[in-house]
From Swiss-Prot:
It comes from the Archaea. The gene is hisS. It is found in: Cytoplasm. Its main location: cytoplasm. Belongs to the class-II aminoacyl-tRNA synthetase family. CDD domains: HisRS-like_core. This is Histidine--tRNA ligase. It comes from Saccharolobus solfataricus (strain ATCC 35092 / DSM 1617 / JCM 11322 / P2). HAMAP family: His_tRNA_synth, HisZ. Its EC number is 6.1.1.21. PANTHER family: HISTIDINE--TRNA LIGASE, MITOCHONDRIAL-RELATED (PTHR43707:SF1), HISTIDYL-TRNA SYNTHETASE (PTHR43707).
Amino acid sequence: MVKFETVRGMKDYIGIDAEKIRYLESTFRDLAKKYGYSEIITPVVEEFKLFELKGGEELRQTMYVFKDKADREISLRPEITPSVARAYIQNLQSSPKPIRLFYFGTVYRYDEPQYGRYREFRQAGIEMIGDSSILADVEVLDLLYNFYDKLNLSKDITIKINNIGIFRKIMDKYNIEDNLQEHVLHLIDKNKVDEALVILEKNIKNKDIMDFLNMILTKKEAKLEDIESLAELEEVSKLDIKNEFEYLLRLSRILSSLNVKFKVDLGFVRGLAYYTGLIFEVLHPSVQFSIAGGGRYDKLIELYGGLPSPAIGFAIGVERTLLVIKDLKVEEPINVIVVGISEEAIPAMFTVSRMLRKEEYKVVINTKDQPLSKLLPYYASQGFKLAIIIGKQELEKNMITVRNLITRKQISIPLENVLDAIKQTL
């Protein structure tokens, strides 16, 4: 007999596990709306070229790509930012700026499955398009921090930040071509710094600059005074990157004033190839990987054929975030089981069920053909708090019996008074 299972790297979420995902989704959605963001829903399937154009070395190698019936090369989205950029050009380019958008959806990557890494997973994220100010950057980071604060994780997480513009400006100055730049950044992202330095040395051929690069790549936690000192170095002036360091100083001071827990890691880069300035990731001490990340991508929309538009955003790994939450208690409505003793009780069963559901109770109608002596203990073991019993005597008097399955307290009252009876038995 054929046996079907989930595809490798994918997972079913049932009951409370599904509820936790929906809880994170609703928490994020409510918060994003309070910041003035509007929801965008984009297709799971996009043209492969959308991601190939500026997807980054790693991303291009780990995608689901196939030909459709029209022989077009199609892919399952490995992330959502390019789809939002495409949708912005297609639908929103003439709208007043900045555009604030948020999303929640599944993405797909053909990675080797392991702890915290899946082939299908969920991302919640935002994009702000049309604003290049530091205020926009702070808003995005503040929203991200407040999301984790709502999950009671703000004391545990650290937001790691850097300015990838430092590396891009240095490589641009020495005319290092784009593809090689992405390869170098990919190596640094994968902690292959020595390999990256070998490539840079072949192209830069300047010992002072290489010493400077070696120094900043090992600055894993730069203090304000470190950044101030670096900004005054002769190499920084020669490379025309003083503004990039001063930006980090300004941002650090603002985040400190907002009590956001962060660190500046000058050796930190992100693997996605479209970042141009600020980059950041959310770290939690219980896992070795980031649980969220993002950055500024000021050239992506122009690359896709749109008008030049600065942009910044982030994506939260939903499943990864759930891994670091120790005790997520999703509020459940009170569970009520409605038991009818005969077929004649069916109209009354549905009448009372409708009344309770309007009041946000979770109501299940019993379909088991078993005696009450077995049904009530069974439903108590399944987490039901109340049972509404409609038997022959109740039908004759237009009454119902409400029983607390925990305390065993019960009362019989007219059907229309069911809400009062529930309050009395709880």
